């Protein structure tokens, strides 16, 4: 599914997205392709299916749970930032804490979040024990 088809699907599921959120979701693919070429955090076969295998599945959480403004959500073992990054776009007034033990993954998460202008994401390398 190309990003344009994905945008049609996401707008069907979430029709009230702001222009900024639409732009962030559209930019997500290019940022992950760029960073995945430098630091392999998503399987090379999965990067072509980023929206269907990672983004849409992450957003499925929003169909059963709505995060309230001012709430804090922790994504333990975030890997490349899923489900945290897509949910942070969808819920800009909710704070998301993404943690993973692998430093290169957290670097990508921080770079993608910065590239999208997400101010509600904090990612750190740590163990969750």
Describe the role of every protein-language-model region.
Residues 59-129:
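Conserved SAM/SAH cofactor-binding pocket of Class I
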Residues 1-69, 74, 111-121:
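Class I SAM-dependent transferase core
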